[in-house]
Amino acid sequence: MARTKMASETVESKNRALVLEAFDTLFNKRDYASAERFWSPNYIQHSAHIPPGREGLFNLVRSVPETMRYENQLIVADGDYVIAHGRFTGMGRPAAWIAADILRFEDGVFAEHWDVLQDEATQEESKSGLPMFGDKFPR
């Protein structure tokens, strides 16, 4: 039992690290050639905001301002699934996007993706009185 748990934690640690590296490579560095190694050519996209496939995602990133940045707050893994809670800023929108990205791994690459995106609330908009990301409200 302990051996299985340790093996699972190793796979999950690796998957978390791969998601963070992939998101930095694509969204922050915009290194499309290097980013290809993280996304399957048969990548399945479930997002209502992103065209199908790996090229749909890459073309979307190409279309947004160079100032776009991704930062991660929390990342969890369970087997072949990783959920990343992050923020996309600098997209030329009135508010940053807070995202929960769900990725499924297959053969060491992203095979499938779902997301939930929401405009980041200001302190005045927050019913809970707490920020959606980090410990401070956006300015």
PLM ranges: what are they?
Residues M1-R139:
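C-terminal and inter-domain tail/linker signature
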